[in-house]
Amino acid sequence: GEPLQHYYLYLFTGDGQELTLAESAPSLYCFPNRLEDITALEYAVSHGGQYAAYYLGCLLLDRSRWQEAQALWERCAENIALPTVWRNLALIYYNKLHDAPRARKAMQTAFAMDKTDARVFFELDQLDKTTNAPYAERLVRMQENTALLPQRDDLYTEYITLLNLDGQYQKAYDCIMEHTFHPWEGGEGKIPAQYRLALMGLARAADDDTALALLQQALTYPHNLGEGKLIGNLDNDLYEMIGELYAKRGDTARAEEAFRLAARGNFDLTGAIYYNDQPPQMMYYAAKALAALGETDEAQKRFAAFIDYAEAHRDDVMEIEYFAVSLPDFLIFEGDLNKNNRVHCCLMEALGALGLGDNERARQAALRGLAENGCQSELNRIVKGIL
């Protein structure tokens, strides 16, 4: 039966059998949320109820009484084998106590207790991502738990992202094409971005004819991605690369057509916080296309503006306004918005320096950004010389 039903019966009758039934009832869908539930659960806890302590901790955390929740869950961890207790403790250790090693140990314990739990595995990976663990280590763990990956689109997308970061473009593409994705709130555009990156990576290693076909393929999303293009996605990077290939062939008419398509869009440098913000690399490719079209002064002005933005905003104190638009990342573990802004400004500086021909400055800016976020895709590609 429902655990809470038996806890209330125990409170009213004092019948120990009701406490036994409450403690042995399935816990999966028990979510105490009312103030009177606190009384019933506290009574059970005072008489040795271990699962009651777990439920009470969940309710108290929701009421911002996290210190009491921590004490209850740490008591539970000594007495019952429930992975969620350790998972919940990881939230306290990281978000409230700012103790990343302790949080990671708790998440590892939770996953070790049930290695079939794809959600806990994903959350463990997100903790490592948040704390800037090397992406190669995360990829190895993914490859050790491949049966879990297709169970969650967010987890599978993270795996494909790591494959692209590692330069395994063919494997990333194959994984994308053999899975049917379902977009989630805030995750819009994530898997199409990896689809495009995989094809762009394959194009860079191919002969010109094959590269052109791959880039043109990337302009259209297959049905299994589950979504179309976001408003404002102008494929500046793809068209700029296509233009370069046509120019290399000497086909100036098609090159100019591609460069004009690449040069479209507003030049509005922002913090790129939300999923539908214009990525700065797209504005970089638009500026490159302008240069290819002979509009050198405007291109140089835009490249310089990237650097000006970085220098003006790298020390900004960032805040999020939760209204209408979802954030692109899963935020169970609290991120550092100011760190994200510093990394973003490193990318801005690197893009501007690349455009102005200062490759060493671009590389140094990218390395500074990677020191704080080693999984940033564009910074990795700048360091590798393949943006």
Where are these regions (language model features)?
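"A position-specific structural signal for the A-helix of alpha-solenoid helical repeats
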Residues: Y8, Y55, N88, E123, ...
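Structural motif corresponding to the intra-repeat A-B loop/turn of tetratricopeptide repeats
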Residues: G16, R63, K96-L97, T131-N132, ...
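Hydrophobic/aromatic packing residues within the alpha-helices of TPR/SEL1-like helical repeat arrays
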Residues: L41, W73, M107, M142-Q143, ...
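TPR alpha-solenoid repeat register
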Residues: P3-Q5, A52, V85-W86, V120, ...
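Short coil turns that delineate tetratricopeptide repeat
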Residues: G1, S46-H47, I80-A81, K115, ...
